[in-house]
Structure formats: C-alpha cells, structure tokens
C-alpha cells in the first residue's frame, strides 16, 4: 500500500508549531531551512506542493519577547499578525536560497464555506501550482473568530490542512507533528505503547485512545489529527502522520518507507 505513495503528485504538507518552535520558544531555523530544501527539491522533481504552516503565534511570541501565550482574543490576534509577517519573511529567505518561489494564502472558514469564494480559492491554488509556486497556507488568525452566529475559525490547522487537501483534490496529506505517529497509548507516558503502521477506519475506539492538547505554543492534539484523518478518508484520500523533527523525512515517506502512521481506506495489500 505504501508503494503507492511514490506516485503521489499533488501533496499537502502540514507542519505544526512544535516542528518550527523549540520548547523554549525560539524559532527552529534549522528545521525551517530543511523544510524549504525538501519542498523545493520535491517541486523540482515535478511534485505539486502546498504547505500548511502553523507557527504565527509562536513566532510572534518570540518576536515580541513574550514567554506566555496571551489569553485575550485581541492580544492573540495582534501577536499572530506580528508572527505571520515574520514567519513568511523567514520562509521567503529560506526558499529563495533554493530558487523556489512561494506565496502566502490566508484563509478563514467562511471563505471556504461560501461556494463562490471557495471556487476563487481553488482557482488561486491551481494557478500557483501551474506556475510552480509553493502556496504557504495558514488560517488568518488576525481576523478569524469563533462565535455561534459568525463562525470563521477552522478550529486548528489540522482541520485546515484536511480541507485544503479536499479542495485541491490532493493525492496525499503529510502531517508532521512532534510524535512518530498514532500510538495505542501516550508514548511519552507509556513506553509499551505501540505505533499503528496503518489505519483504515476512524472509529470511537481510536478517539478514546487519543487525548490531550498539543504543545504549549500550538493548539492541535491527537484528537484533532484523527478528525483531520477522518475528513481525508471520507474523501478517498490518504494521510501520513509522522514526526517533523527532521523535515527531510518527507523524502523517505514518499519512497514508501514504513514511517509514521498511514491513514488510508481499504485493508493491507501486497503492493
């Protein structure tokens, strides 16, 4: 089944805050550089790459010398505004090193749910990919809000990456996190926890196994990743959950190596 990953042409890569920010709050420039190199190389191979990148608030905290994430919405959105600009500046520097053009795409949930604007977003993605430009996507944290009568947030970038995967009809979603894949238990607590190599169906039992929030600077936990996988499988697409500490692991994933957890419809096959 994993050999089919070698044939994936249109690929969405999602990187979490934990892959971009050290636990002490500093920006992991080495990881960002490695990510830019990897995605640029894949683009040169003829792959169509879309990057969904978290990290706006984490980078903003670093830029503003703040050690604690703000609690009020206006403060969080101000930090995100500062961080998004700085994050794109860093990406632009690193991708330029490898002569790869990139573009920023900021989305909110209402834009995707309204058919006309959703169609415009899809057309923009198609045009960027046609021009061999890597779109870098994030939720527009500066304006997105979550209210009962006006819901504009996706929830987190795990959901956003699955939605992007859906609207561009990608072959594969590669979700890079701070964990090696989906385990039978929390591997940081239980050393006997086993890694699922392949999951074909998302059920309540799996959600029971998933628990806890994400990193101090991010929002997504394992339940969020399961929800994203559920959306991906519903659209007959595939998703890999793997550790993003070394972004070049994407090369090995696309070679079909047994890395992380593969979420895909159907059972085990000889291929």
From Swiss-Prot:
Family in the record: Belongs to the glutamate 5-kinase family.
Signal peptide: none
Sites where the protein binds ATP: 14, 177-178, 219-225
Function recorded in the entry: Catalyzes the transfer of a phosphate group to glutamate to form L-glutamate 5-phosphate.
The EC number(s) this enzyme carries: 2.7.2.11
Residues the record lists as binding substrate: 54, 141, 157
Species name: Enterococcus faecalis (strain ATCC 700802 / V583)
Highest classification ranks of the organism: Bacteria, Bacillati, Bacillota, Bacilli, Lactobacillales
GO function term, MF aspect, one: glutamate 5-kinase activity
Top class in the EC scheme: transferase
A GO BP annotation: L-proline biosynthetic process
Name of this protein: Glutamate 5-kinase
UniProt entry keywords in alphabetical sequence: Amino-acid biosynthesis, ATP-binding, Cytoplasm, Kinase, Nucleotide-binding, Proline biosynthesis, Transferase
Gene Ontology CC entries for this record: cytosol
């Amino acid at each position: 089944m994993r050999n089919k990953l070698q044939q994936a042409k249109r690929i969405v890569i999602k990187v979490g805050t934990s892959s971009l920010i050290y636990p002490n709050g500093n920006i992991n420039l080495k990881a960002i550089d490695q990510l830019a190199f990897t995605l640029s190389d894949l683009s040169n191979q003829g792959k169509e790459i879309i990057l969904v990148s978290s990290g706006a608030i984490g980078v903003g905290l670093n830029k503003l010398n703040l050690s604690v994430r703000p609690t009020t919405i206006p403060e969080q959105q101000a930090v995100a505004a500062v961080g998004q600009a700085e994050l794109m500046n860093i990406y632009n520097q690193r991708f330029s090193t490898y002569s790869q053009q990139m573009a920023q795409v900021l989305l909110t949930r209402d834009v995707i749910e309204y058919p006309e604007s959703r169609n415009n977003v899809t057309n923009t993605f198609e045009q960027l990919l046609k021009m061999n430009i890597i779109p870098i996507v994030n939720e527009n944290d500066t304006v997105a809000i979550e209210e009962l009568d006006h819901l504009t947030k996706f929830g987190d970038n795990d959901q956003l990456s699955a939605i992007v995967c859906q609207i561009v009809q990608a072959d594969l979603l590669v979700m890079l996190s701070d964990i090696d894949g989906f385990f039978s238990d929390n591997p940081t607590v239980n050393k006997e926890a086993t890694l699922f190599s392949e999951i074909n169906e998302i059920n309540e039992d799996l959600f029971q196994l998933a628990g806890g929030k994400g990193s101090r600077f991010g929002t997504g936990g394992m339940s969020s990743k399961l929800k994203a996988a559920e959306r991906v499988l519903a659209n007959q697409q595939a998703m890999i959950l793997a550790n993003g500490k070394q972004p070049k692991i994407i090369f090995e994933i696309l070679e079909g190596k047994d890395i992380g957890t593969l979420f895909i419809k159907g059972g085990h096959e000889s291929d």
